Regions:
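Conserved N-terminal beta-strand and adjoining loop/helix that marks the start
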Residues: 1-20
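Short, acidic/hydrophobic/Gly-rich beta-strand patch recurrent on exposed beta strands
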Residues: 22-25
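Short small-residue beta-strand/loop micro-motif enriched in glycine and branched aliphatics
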Residues: 31-34
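Unchanged
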Residues: 37-128
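Generic C-terminal helix-cap and adjacent flexible tail
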Residues: 131-135
Length: 135
């Protein structure tokens, strides 16, 4: 069994009195999710999340390590993948998609994010993040 680990975050901003989160659409599969990527040797989970968000979107973030949610799934029969998600406040709002991987990026009102997200695991995490961001 192969084990893979990725880290990412629900990136948010406060915009005109609302909370919006950043969603990305992947080129290969066409699914909507959060920015994330594989942990590189010597990196912490937080460092991985920051690097991947910057690479995929061009946005710098402040990670809140007190919010840490994990998702586990099997992308292939012999592979278990664990994804660690944090919440992260955007320091800048203009995005620049990583053209090799990202088809589209958009800011979405957190209350409507579950209608855009593809996977149920992501919808569950955004509901938990919603509470953490508002508290």
């Amino acid at each position: 069994m192969t084990h893979e680990k990725s880290c990412g975050a629900i990136v948010y901003r406060r915009y005109h009195g609302n909370i919006e989160i950043l969603l990305i659409k992947h080129i290969n599969s066409g699914h909507w999710s959060f920015p994330k990527g594989h942990v590189e040797e010597g990196e912490t989970e937080v460092e991985t999340a920051q690097r991947e968000i910057k690479e995929e979107t061009g946005i710098d973030v402040i990670i809140d390590p007190t919010f840490r949610e994990t998702v586990q799934y099997f992308p292939r029969k012999d592979t278990q993948k664990v994804v660690v998600y944090f919440i992260a406040k955007a320091k800048n709002y203009d995005f620049f998609p990583q053209e090799e991987e990202i088809a589209e990026i958009k800011w979405v009102d957190i209350g409507h994010a579950t209608t855009v997200l593809t996977y149920e695991n992501d919808k569950s995490i955004v509901n938990k993040a919603k509470k953490a961001i508002r508290d």
